[in-house]
Amino acid sequence: MSVASQSLNSSSAGSALVELVDVVKVYATAAGEFTALKGINMQVGRGEFVGVIGKSGAGKSTLLNMITGVDHLTSGEVVVNSNGSPVSIHKMSEDQIALWRGHNLGVVYQSFQLLPMLTLVENITLPMDLCGRFNPKQSRERALELLRLVEIEDQADKLPAHISGGQQQRVAIARALANDPPILVADEPTGSLDSVTSEHIFEVFEHLVSELGKTIIMVTHDQSLAPRFTRALRIADGELVHSEQSEEGMR
């Protein structure tokens, strides 16, 4: 059995929340075509904390971009079954993808990407207001609840510049949860943080999976995190080369 088939079968087909089928991504460069993803097949089940581990340039971020729909795939398919109705992401228009993503997917970046002119609580209410899921009073109450979840509620009315990098990442996680999406994707969320802060952030993700039932797909270059995920996938040169189940991450 190939590595791609192993990773595809490691979650049962009936419970797959996210499925990638023969996903290929080719970029046109001055030096010619560059294939960033080479026929990726994988499934992610509900409630999994999946780590995609690889070196810089291995294709980790490109893989996340295919799942979130922020970039076009060259061939293949990405299917997400978040509410009982499977959606083929790349068959939707960009406007449809943006609306779908707002309700179904939370994204956490390494660089936080908080809006500097808005307070922390306003950064979290903004995606709620854009999706129209809550009225203004409900939005603020929910934002404060999410800040409480990531243990930074007392900083709610500060601007991002007035808190630390680790605190900003906590706010970014709260913002990703704003519309209560079933799926979070995280692109090197601890990459710019010190080891102690990184551990705190990772514990937040573990809590979201174990206590709130979220499904998380996280890419990282940090090999030492592999045992902490429920499943770790290794990516190199645009291909999945290894898949391993973790006893520690499953506890």
Per-range role (PLM):
Residues 1-26, 242-251:
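ABC-family P-loop ATPase nucleotide-binding domain
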